[in-house]
């Protein structure tokens, strides 16, 4: 975050200076989502630079900055990408179990409302990513907890096919 400026990365600059209360309570979920997506679009250039510096060839990467519309132009012919999209119920359940979430929520005026806004925003973000990926004919795997980890791994391996070597 030290290399961002209000001029070049306005969303990153704005969000990086918000309190948790501002981030999750004082703005509508729609505004949160709009600014969240703008943040990730700005951050994508930094992520891409790091990936290009470290890897020459296929890469496995994760992060909200890797929006399908931003990744797509960088895929070489024959390369594939898949987005694992959490179901809202799955995400709410697992986020509520993370100890650091409580620390963040305790910094807000209304922890229950903040959590609900956060999870609603994230559910809408998941829908946004899923729609982008499908529009570009990129892979999507919905994660809802209905299959175990090995089944998820198997599904991803099947999507990518046999390793090239």
What feature does the model see in each segment?
Residues 6-17, 78-79, 101, 159-160:
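Short, hinge-like loop/turn segments at secondary-structure boundaries
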Residues 2-58:
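Conserved nucleotide-sensing/catalytic segment adjacent to the nucleotide-binding pocket
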Residues 31-47, 113-131:
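Alpha-helix-centered segments that form part of catalytic cores
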Residues 52-55, 59-108:
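ATP-dependent NMP and nucleoside kinases share a basic, alpha-helical "lid"
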Residues 16-31, 98-115:
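A solvent-exposed, charged loop/short amphipathic helix patch at secondary-structure junctions
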Residues 34-35, 59-61, 140-143:
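Short catalytic-loop micro-motif centered on adjacent basic/acidic residues
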Residues 124-165:
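NTP-dependent small-molecule kinase module
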Residues 43-52, 69, 136, 141-142, ...:
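Conformational switch/transducer regions in large eukaryotic molecular machines and scaffolds
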């Amino acid at each position: 975050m030290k290399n961002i400026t209000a001029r070049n990365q306005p969303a990153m600059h704005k969000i990086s200076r918000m309190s948790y209360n501002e981030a999750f309570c004082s703005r509508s979920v729609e505004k949160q989502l709009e600014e969240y997506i703008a943040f990730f679009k700005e951050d994508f250039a930094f992520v891409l630079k790091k990936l290009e510096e470290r890897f020459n060839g296929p890469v496995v990467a994760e992060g909200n900055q890797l929006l399908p519309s931003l990744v797509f132009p960088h895929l070489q012919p024959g390369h594939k990408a898949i987005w694992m999209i959490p179901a809202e119920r799955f995400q709410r359940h697992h986020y509520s179990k993370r100890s650091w979430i409580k620390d963040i929520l305790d910094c807000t005026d209304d922890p229950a409302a903040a959590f609900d806004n956060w999870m609603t925003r994230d559910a809408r973000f998941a829908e946004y990513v899923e729609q982008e990926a499908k529009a570009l004919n990129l892979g999507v795997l919905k994660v809802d907890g209905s299959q175990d980890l090995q089944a998820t791994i198997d599904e991803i391996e099947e999507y990518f096919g046999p390793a090239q070597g």
